[in-house]
Amino acid sequence: MLEDLKRQVLEANLALPKHNLVTLTWGNVSAVDRERGVLVIKPSGVDYSVMTADDMVVVSLESGEVVEGHKKPSSDTPTHRLLYQAFPTIGGIVHTHSRHATIWAQAGQPIPATGTTHADYFYGTIPCTRKMTEAEINGEYEWETGNVIVETFEKQGIDAAQMPGVLVHSHGPFAWGKNAEDAVHNAIVLEEVAYMGIFCRQLAPQLPDMQQSLLDKHYLRKHGAKAYYGQ
C-alpha cells in the first residue's frame, strides 16, 4: 500500500541529516494521501542510517490508528494529523530541532522578515506560538501542540499556504509544503533564515522589518497569481 508515498517520505526523512537539520533521531517527515484518508510518517526512534521504505508507517488521518506498518509511528504523529486536518492545502510536514530555529523557539521569539531570502518563502514574520498550558502539557500533549499552532495562525490571521512554517514556544520548528520534499525544502530555508536572523539582531538590535513593498515583490513574484521568478 502506498509504496511510492513511502519512498518519498523515506527520501525526505533521509534529507534531514544530509542538510544538518537533525541530531540523532530528533526529527520526522510525513506526507498525506487525502483521497485515502491516511498519512505516511517516519517510525519512532529508528536511526536514519538503517531506515528503509518498509519502516514507514501508514496512519489513519481521522483516528490515528496504524493502518499498515510493523513499527510504532513517530510520537509527533498527532501533531501532524491535526495540522493536515486544519490546513487542507498542505501535503507534507517536517518537524526538527534544527539548531538556530530552535534557539528562536526556546527564546519564544518570532523570526522577523528582514531580507529577501526570507521573503522568497515566508510572507511575513515567522510566528512563534504561546507557551502551552499545564493542562495542555499534561493532557494530549502532541495533539495540543498542533492546536496551539492552529490557534496562532487563526488569531494572527495567517494563511498556512503563505507561511509554511512556525516555531512552537520552548520546543522547535515545524514546516510544511505541497509534498514531503517541498516541506523539507521549506525547513531548510527556515533554519537558514533563523541563522541569518540571529546575526542580524546582533549587528543591528533595532533593525526594522524589511519594506512591505520589497516583501510583496519577492514573495508574490514566486508565489502570486502572476508569479514569474525562478533561479
Curated annotation (Swiss-Prot):
EC number(s) stated in the UniProt entry for this protein: 5.1.3.4
Cofactor note: Binds 1 zinc ion per subunit.
Pathway in which the depicted protein is active: Carbohydrate degradation; L-arabinose degradation via L-ribulose; D-xylulose 5-phosphate from L-arabinose (bacterial route): step 3/3
Swiss-Prot/TrEMBL catalytic activity: L-ribulose 5-phosphate = D-xylulose 5-phosphate
Database matches in SUPFAM superfamilies: AraD/HMP-PK domain-like
Residues annotated as catalytic: D120, Y229
GO CC, alphabetical: cytosol
GO biological process: L-arabinose catabolic process to xylulose 5-phosphate; pentose catabolic process
Keyword set includes Membrane: no
Binding site for substrate: G27, N28, S44, G45, S74, S75
Enzyme class: isomerase
Keyword 4Fe-4S: no
Molecular function, one GO term: aldehyde-lyase activity
Assembly, per entry: Homotetramer.
UniProt family annotation: Belongs to the aldolase class II family. AraD/FucA subfamily.
Function: Involved in the degradation of L-arabinose. Catalyzes the interconversion of L-ribulose 5-phosphate (LRu5P) and D-xylulose 5-phosphate (D-Xu5P) via a retroaldol/aldol mechanism (carbon-carbon bond cleavage analogous to a class II aldolase reaction).
Name of the molecule in the record: L-ribulose-5-phosphate 4-epimerase
Source organism per UniProt: Salmonella typhimurium (strain LT2 / SGSC1412 / ATCC 700720)
